[in-house]
From Swiss-Prot:
Pfam families the UniProt entry points to: Exonuc_VII_L (PF02601), tRNA_anti_2 (PF13742)
Entry keywords, A to Z: Cytoplasm, Exonuclease, Hydrolase, Nuclease
Record organism: Rickettsia felis (strain ATCC VR-1525 / URRWXCal2)
Disulfide bonds: none
Family: Belongs to the XseA family.
Protein name in the entry: Exodeoxyribonuclease 7 large subunit
Main location: cytoplasm
Gene Ontology, cellular component aspect: cytoplasm; exodeoxyribonuclease VII complex
Length: 450
C-alpha cells in the first residue's frame, strides 16, 4: 500500500510536516491495536513520570513510550533485559522521523521474568503480614455459598453438581473473567461485592475457582489487589485455582486452599447421606443414654423410698423412747424433789456457826504471821553474816592492803608488769608502785644475784 501511495503521489511535493502526518496516518490506520513480544532495553523514566525504552529482538529494535497513567497500572517494576508482551498502537514521532509503539498494557512474557516478579511480590506481601492472618473457619452447614468463577466452562458445572450431590444448598454465582488483563480486578471486586451484601443475602462461604493452566493463564490470581481483597474478606474464602500442583498468591491469603474446584465444593458442604447416618447414630446413642439415665433415676427413687421408710420407722422408735422417758421423768420428779428437800433439811442441822469459824481462822492467821516474822529475821541475820565474811575476804585480797604490808609492784617503761628476774633483765627504766605512791627508777648497773 505504501508503494502504491508513493507511485500515485510521485509528482506531488510535500512539506516535512505533511509527509510526517501522512506516514503517521498510514501506520495507525494499517496496524491499529497490536501486540508485540520482546526484551526491554535502554529503559528511562522521565521526571514527568513517562517511561521510554526499546523493545528488541536480536538486531531489531522498536521504540516504545509508556505514559504515566499506564505506567502506574503496571504492578511490577520494569528492568532492562525483562521479556514482556506489549499491547498498544503504532504511531510516528515527527520530532526525529521515527515510529514508536504507544503502550496500553504490558505483561511479563518469559517464565523466568514472571517467576521473579511473583517471588518479589510474594516476599513483599508476606512481609506485610497478608499471608499470616487468622483463618476464618469454614462453617459446617452453610446456608448460602458464593462462587466466583467464569460462567462458562466445566468448573462452575463441576462445583454445582458436586454441591447438589453432597448437600443441596443455595448457590450464588458471581461471574468473572478468570484470565486476561482485567480479571484480577474483577475477582477482587466480586469478593468485595459479596462482603458488602446485606446479611440476609450474604453467603456463608466464598469459593474462588478456576481450572488448570500455565503460569500465564493463572497470573490473574497472583494480582496484588486480589490478594488484599482475600485478606480483608470477612467471609471465609476457599481458593480452588488450577490443579493440586498449581499455587497462586490467593491460596496463601485465603482461609482454605482446595487442590481442585471439585474439592472446594467438598470442603464447603458435607455429604448429606453420611450426615443423616451420623445423625441417626447420634439419635440412637442419645436414646440409649436417655433410657439408661431414666432407669438410673428410677432406681434412685426406689432407693430413696426405702431410705425414707427406714428413717420413718427409726424416728417413730425414737419418738416412742422419748415419750417413755418423759413419762418416767414425770413419775420420778416428786420423789426427786422430796429427796432434795430432805438433804436441805439435813444440811441446815449440820451447818457450823460462822462466828466460830471466824475466830478459828483469826487464831490460825496470828500463828502464821509470827512464824513468818521469825523466819524472815533468821534469814536476814544469816545474809548479814555472810556479807561481813565476804567483805573481810575481799579486803584481804585487795593489792593496796598488800602494799601496806611492805610489798611493791614493779612495771616496765611501757607499763608492763615485771613478775620475775627474766622479765626485768631487758628493762632500763622501772616504775615502782608503793602503797602511798609511785617512783621511777633508772638502772645504771646490774648486780649479779641468784
Amino acid at each position: 500500500m505504501l508503494d502504491n501511495f508513493i507511485a500515485n503521489q510521485a509528482t506531488k511535493e510535500f512539506s516535512v510536516s505533511e509527509i510526517s502526518n501522512k506516514i503517521k496516518e498510514l501506520l495507525e490506520n494499517n496496524f491499529g491495536y497490536i501486540k508485540v513480544k520482546g526484551e526491554i532495553s535502554g529503559l528511562k523514566i522521565a521526571s514527568s513520570g513517562h517511561a521510554y525504552f526499546n523493545l528488541k529482538e536480536n538486531t531489531a529494535i522498536l521504540a516504545c513510550t509508556c505514559w504515566r497513567p499506564i505506567l502506574a497500572k503496571i504492578k511490577f517494576p520494569l528492568n532492562d533485559g525483562m521479556e514482556v508482551v506489549i499491547s498498544g498502537k503504532l504511531s510516528s514521532y515527527a520530532g526525529n522521523s521515527r515510529y514508536q509503539l504507544s503502550v496500553d498494557n504490558l505483561q511479563p512474557a518469559g517464565l523466568g521474568a514472571m517467576l521473579q516478579i511473583l517471588n518479589e511480590r510474594k516476599a513483599r506481601l508476606e512481609k506485610e503480614g497478608l499471608f499470616n492472618k487468622i483463618r476464618i473457619p469454614i462453617p459446617f452447614l452453610p446456608d448460602k455459598i458464593g462462587v466466583i468463577t467464569s460462567i462458562t466452562g466445566a468448573v462452575i458445572k463441576d462445583i454445582i453438581h458436586r454441591i447438589r450431590e453432597r448437600f443441596p444448598t443455595r448457590i450464588i454465582i458471581w461471574p468473572v473473567s478468570v484470565q486476561g488483563e482485567n480479571s484480577g480486578n474483577e475477582i477482587a471486586e466480586a469478593i468485595e461485592g459479596f462482603n458488602n451484601l446485606e446479611e440476609i443475602n450474604k453467603p456463608s462461604v466464598i469459593i474462588v475457582a478456576r481450572g488448570g493452566g500455565s503460569i500465564e493463564d493463572l497470573w490473574s490470581f497472583n494480582d496484588e489487589i486480589l490478594v488484599r481483597a482475600a485478606y480483608n474478606s470477612k467471609i471465609p474464602i476457599i481458593s480452588a485455582v488450577g490443579h493440586e500442583v498449581d499455587y497462586t498468591l490467593i491460596d496463601l491469603a485465603a482461609d482454605k486452599r482446595a487442590p481442585t474446584p471439585t474439592a472446594a465444593a467438598e470442603f464447603a458442604v458435607p455429604v448429606r447421606s453420611i450426615l443423616n447416618n451420623t445423625l441417626q447414630s447420634y439419635e440412637k446413642i442419645l436414646l440409649n443414654n436417655t433410657s439408661r439415665l431414666i432407669k438410673y433415676h428410677e432406681q434412685n427413687i426406689i432407693n430413696y423410698d426405702k431410705i425414707h421408710r427406714y428413717l420413718s420407722h427409726y424416728m417413730n422408735n425414737k419418738q416412742q423412747l422419748l415419750d417413755e422417758t418423759g413419762f418416767n421423768l414425770l413419775d420420778a420428779l416428786p420423789c426427786f424433789i422430796e429427796l432434795q428437800e430432805t438433804k436441805i433439811k439435813s444440811f441446815s442441822k449440820e451447818r457450823v456457826n460462822p462466828a466460830k469459824i471466824l475466830n478459828y481462822k483469826t487464831l490460825e492467821l496470828t500463828h502464821q504471821t509470827a512464824y513468818l516474822s521469825k523466819s524472815a529475821n533468821n534469814t536476814l541475820k544469816n545474809f548479814e553474816y555472810k556479807l561481813e565474811l565476804n567483805s573481810t575476804l575481799l579486803a584481804s585480797l585487795d593489792y593496796n592492803n598488800v602494799l601496806k604490808r611492805g610489798f611493791a609492784i614493779v612495771k616496765g617503761e611501757t607499763g608492763n608488769f615485771l613478775s620475775s628476774k627474766i622479765t626485768a633483765a631487758n628493762e632500763k627504766i622501772f616504775n615502782i608502785k608503793f602503797s602511798d605512791g609511785e617512783i621511777k627508777v633508772v638502772r645504771n648497773t646490774v648486780i649479779a644475784s641468784d
